[in-house]
């Protein structure tokens, strides 16, 4: 099977051979399920669909996700082993089927740099694949390590002695976990100093969100998009909050510092 193929200069596709009639695509606060073939009323020869962060397909044994950065158009080629074709560059000389409307600037003449990622995954790892697809949207952030106190006591030393090793998880600002649950917002309140965090459950079934009560948290409560205070949450004996999120639910929490 082809690892990667191309139908021309405009797109790239991955043949998969997965035995399924549907696929998944990231949308606004949801991962939608779509049919690989359009219904009989579809007459357009192009079967392109809209995606945001990724498109994926899976059967009972395997799955494959194609993440992208800014490549929002894809098409499933059902007659080519269910390949996912991602549009890399769309260049057109004219628009419209009711006349001739030249669009010379839309020919996209030049050099372009594009980014996408192919993520194979096993059955039962759908949530982890989604997490990788969302993580691909973010650049790594570098942070300078602190200086060794021993270096401060060495007179005349010019080159700093950097501290190495792993950052301790105990000092994390917010630790959470949940199959297919992702953080979508972290902000200070508009009318008060409380912090607000928002999660979405991208799975088609209920999932449990768990997050630890950090030392800086005085109180955690359910909230909404207008930052109203709702039910106050209580952690378990280990200092962990557990909240069940319904399928595709968007949940907002307020945190009192």
Question: Which sequence ranges carry the predicted segments?
Answer:
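Terminal accessory/anchoring regions of large secretory-pathway or extracellular enzymes
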Residues: 1, 6, 11-257
């Amino acid at each position: 099977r082809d690892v990667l193929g191309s139908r021309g200069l405009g797109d790239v596709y991955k043949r998969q051979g997965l035995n399924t009639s549907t696929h998944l695509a990231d949308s606004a606060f949801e991962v939608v399920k779509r049919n690989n073939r359009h219904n009989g009323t579809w007459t357009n020869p192009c079967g392109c669909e809209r995606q945001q962060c990724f498109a994926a397909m899976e059967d009972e044994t395997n799955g494959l996700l194609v993440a992208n950065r800014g490549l929002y158009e894809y098409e499933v080629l059902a007659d080519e082993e269910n390949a996912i074709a991602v549009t890399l560059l769309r260049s057109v000389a004219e628009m419209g089927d009711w006349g001739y409307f030249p669009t010379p600037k839309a020919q996209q003449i030049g050099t372009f740099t594009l980014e996408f990622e192919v993520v194979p995954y096993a059955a039962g790892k759908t949530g982890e694949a989604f997490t990788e697809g969302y993580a691909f949207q973010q650049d790594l952030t570098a942070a300078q390590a602190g200086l060794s106190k021993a270096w401060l006591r060495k007179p005349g030393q010019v080159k700093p002695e950097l501290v190495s090793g792993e950052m301790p998880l105990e000092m994390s600002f917010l630790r959470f976990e949940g199959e297919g649950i992702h953080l979508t917002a972290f902000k200070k309140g508009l009318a008060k100093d409380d912090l607000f965090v928002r999660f979405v459950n991208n799975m088609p079934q209920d999932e449990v969100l768990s997050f630890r009560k950090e030392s800086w948290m005085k109180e955690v409560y359910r909230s909404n998009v207008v930052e109203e205070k709702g039910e106050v949450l209580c952690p378990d004996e280990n200092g962990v909050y557990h909240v069940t999120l319904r399928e595709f639910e968007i949940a907002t929490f307020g945190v009192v510092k």
